[in-house]
Amino acid sequence: MRKASRSVGAAPKVPANNKSQATERSKSESSAPTASKVSRPGSSLSKAKSNDDLLAGMAGGLPASNSVKVKKNSTTSYPNSGTAMSGQEGRTRSSAGSSSNTKRSGSSGAKEVGSSRERLRERSRLTANKKPQGLGVGTGEVSAPSKRSRGRTDSDMIRMSKSKSDNQISDRAALEAKVKELMNLAKNKDAEILLLRTELRDTRSQLGQDVSDKSPDDLPLIHLQEQNTTVCEELQQLKSENRMLKDRLNALGFSLGQQPDDPDKLYGFQSLGINPGSHSDCGGGTLTSSVEGSAPGSMEDLLSQDESTLTGERRSSSMDNLDSECSEVYQPLTSSDDALDAPSSSSESEGLPSTERSRKGSSGNASEVSVACLTERIHQMEENQHSTAEELQATLQELADLQQITQELNSENERLGEEKVILMDSLCQQSDKLELFSRQLEYAQALLDEHHIAYSLDEDLKSSRYLDLEQRYMDLAENGRFEREQLLGVQQHLSNSLKMAEQDNKDAQDVIRALKERNHHMERIAEAEQLSKQALAATLEEYKATLNSEQGECARLKALLEQEKQRVAELYSIHSSGDASHIQNLLESVRSDKEKAESLASSLQEELLHARTDVNRMQDAFGKLEDEYRAFREEAQKQVSELTLALEKVRHELEEKETELSDMKETIFELEDEVEQHRAVKLHDNLIISDVENAVKKLQDQKHDMEREIKILNRKLREESAEWRQFQADLQTAVVIANDIKSEAQEEIGELKRQLQEALEKNEKLAKEMENATSRKQEEERGRVYNYMNAVERDLAALRQGMGLNRRSSTSSDPAPTVKTLIKSFDNASSQAAAVAAAAATPISRTPLSPSPMKTPPAAAVSPMQRHSISGPISVAKSLPGLSEKRPSYAEIPVQEHMLRSSSSSRSAASLPRVPAIDNAKSISVSRRSSEELKRDISVPDGSSAPSLMVMTSPSPQLSLSSSSPTASVTPTARSRIREERKDPLAALAREYGGSKRNALLKWCQKKTEGYPNIDITNFSSSWNDGLAFCALLHTYLPAHIPYQELTNQDKRRNFTLAFQAAESVGIKSTLDINEMVRTERPDWQCLMTYVTSIYKYFET
């Protein structure tokens, strides 16, 4: 425990608030989740309140038990603190134990300080007056040895942890109850906001005036705007303070994410000590922090250090440190996003003067913050986000197309490389032949020189010998040609005869094959008949045997009949002589036997008759089959004999044809040998040499051409590959930055929505006042509206001139945004946000509910087709309700959105200044540009003079950004480029404007619709949802079909119907559904871009 008494001569001085922050950090961490839960639902409501309301609300949410406990602890801790400093060592366990109550009271008081400024000041004065009384003895008796025991039971530790956990539980319950209350209040406010919106809309429609009318009833709204501005500034201040405190905690080695598991770990920080000798040397105002390794100090050391810190600070009578401690204790309870719920103690220490200064500083910008402004700003940010997403999708689509084109170019390059290798091989072969023929020519010349034979070409041409040789050669060539033709005719005749013979042979073979098959078929039929005949014979034999058996049975039955007759006779004789009854029985039995025998005989007789009829029928069928078989056999034998004769004849003819064919082949071979001999004679060395020389010249020319083309292709391939890699890197960077911007925009949109909700809560007061003002001052308001309309018309007339000049200068000087300029603008946006916000103030003063100053567009631009028929610009009459329907100026648009706008047609007099990254023109376009165009792009200054409003109908000189795309540069001729443009009409447009095809088409649409009112084309979705953009685009080509002056953005169906009918009248098929376009606010940008592309293709290609 004595290691904290080390000398502090070289130790740096540490402010007292750091130690207080270290001791209270565990309590703030344990209550941080509850505080964050409270801060989020309450942030939107607290912004609408004043500073006093916020303080009262936060003070009312804390339980009253904490304040009672604080006062009790503070009154009981002073005797203990006086006794603690009586010993020689001020950091013994006894002094630390007596100061533990002081620490608890200090931490509880610090937690309540963040809620109420008045209670904080009273408590700080109390402790400042009482603690020096108890510490006066302690400082005088520093050198006296301490006699108290260092024993301290664990019951104090358990009691401290229980009291601390009880405080946290009570605080959490109170905060949860406040969260529920604030949630219910937020739901009620939402319902009131909806009701207020409907009442405000009805009131506007009843009054028939614009929101920009200024009346004495707008004073509460001005007060609301001032409060909103003050709250926003306090929010920024609290965020900066929170960030500073986090940095200080990190510098001290503490992390806000630490959550101790048990109460003992709450004090597991680095041990902080005080040197008693430094109090006597420096008057008790010097504080030290001795950090020895990472060994955690005891709880008593930490509490005694805090007591010494507070004592030294009370002696120096510095209230700023106490306020800083309170802010550091309370500040970790809130996050940077919800810092509005926690009142800033540093701003509280400044008091009323700081509030007055902040209100004075924000009074100049109070007129710009209103409900309509916030709504329009959110709308602009959403439009910017959708435009960015649409542009990224189009860029990825074109990236896939470029990858496919690159693959095709690579395959074409490989094919050209293979052809180059083939040509090089052919050239080498021809070179070898040329060298061979040159050696032969030299050898022939040497032979002629050796034999002293003149070989001059002129003499040979003139000599008769050369003429005779030439004539003989011509005769021989003619005879050879004639004989060759005759031989070819004979060969053709013989080949035809051979084909005919082969065909006849094939037919004969087919007939023989058919006859053989028929013969086999007949033989199979005869065999089948033979088998049936044998079966019939067997059946007949069976029937004969049956007949014989039946005949024997009949003879036996006849013998039995005779026997029975004899017996009957005997019976009659017996009957006549014997008993009559007995004889009668015998007769009946005999008669029954007789009947049975007769029935059996009749059945056998019938069976015999059936058997005889079957035998007769079988014999007849067998005879017929024998006759048919005999006739068929004779006919088959006759056909076989005839076919055999025909086969022999065909074989004989085939043998004759084969002999003739062999003879013809021999003749053909002989004729071919003669032809070859004539050819060998015909081919002379002079003709061969001349042919070879011509071929060598041609090949050399082809070689030079191919080498030149190969060099050009290699150079272009290297350039395109370098550009492609740069484009991929730029695109990846742009995608990453766009995602970051998107997330930041979403966060800002959420915050703005909360601010809007808070601002709209105050509109409830205005509803009743506006209703009363409607009944009492309707006539007065109408007169005021009339006067205000005249004033606005005068202001707009002044704006029309200045903004027209501004617009023309920005249109002619702004280069087309590329990927690099987009990236640089994103990088510079954050650093220039403050300067741009200061420069964005509009020069025209207006009321908080008045609309932002709009641009007055110049006269409508006249297309080249209309210049011969339209002499003057299109005049546009503007009314006050029309101004409220238009979109706001660029004064409230962030720098990122301003840079993403590809058109400058909607810039107002208060538009944001251009980012220097674009003005310097240091970016390089993704597509290739020529050096002259790049110099022209760089040489155009930002402040270049623009033409006046009177000459707006003439075409202004635009910055030439024409460039050749990678695919167009590969094609060698203009005809192939025309074919490519017909295949992809946007390729030429991308070369003309630079950048992607989507951006090029967007710039073309902006250029065509320049000067038309109510047109602001920034994307291919929401900018076209009212149909006016289609009508303006087609009006430049078909003015007779579209009465543009009669159109409004309210009647969408009529606008789309007129535009589609005008396009279909010239043959442009409509691919969009009118019902779908009228129903949706953001149509599919790909379908819409396809339709605009078809319009461009029809009128421009």
Swiss-Prot record:
It is found in: Cytoplasm, Cytoskeleton; Cytoplasm, Cytoskeleton, Spindle; Cell junction, Gap junction. Its main location: cytoplasm. May interact with both microtubules and actin cytoskeleton. Residues 162-254, 373-427, 492-785 form a coiled coil. InterPro entries: CH_dom, CH_dom_sf, F-actin_Monoox_Mical. It comes from Xenopus tropicalis (Western clawed frog). GO terms for cellular component: cytoplasm; gap junction; spindle. Residues 995-1100 form the Calponin-homology (CH) domain. Residues 1-170, 280-366, 923-978 are annotated as: Disordered. Pfam families: CH. This is Cytospin-A. Involved in cytokinesis and spindle organization. May play a role in actin cytoskeleton organization and microtubule stabilization and hence required for proper cell adhesion and migration. Belongs to the cytospin-A family. SMART domains: CH. Residues 114-125, 151-165, 929-939 have a biased composition (Basic and acidic residues). Keywords: Cell cycle, Cell division, Cell junction, Coiled coil, Cytoplasm, Cytoskeleton, Gap junction. Residues 93-110, 333-355, 953-975 have a biased composition (Low complexity). The keyword Ribonucleoprotein does not apply.
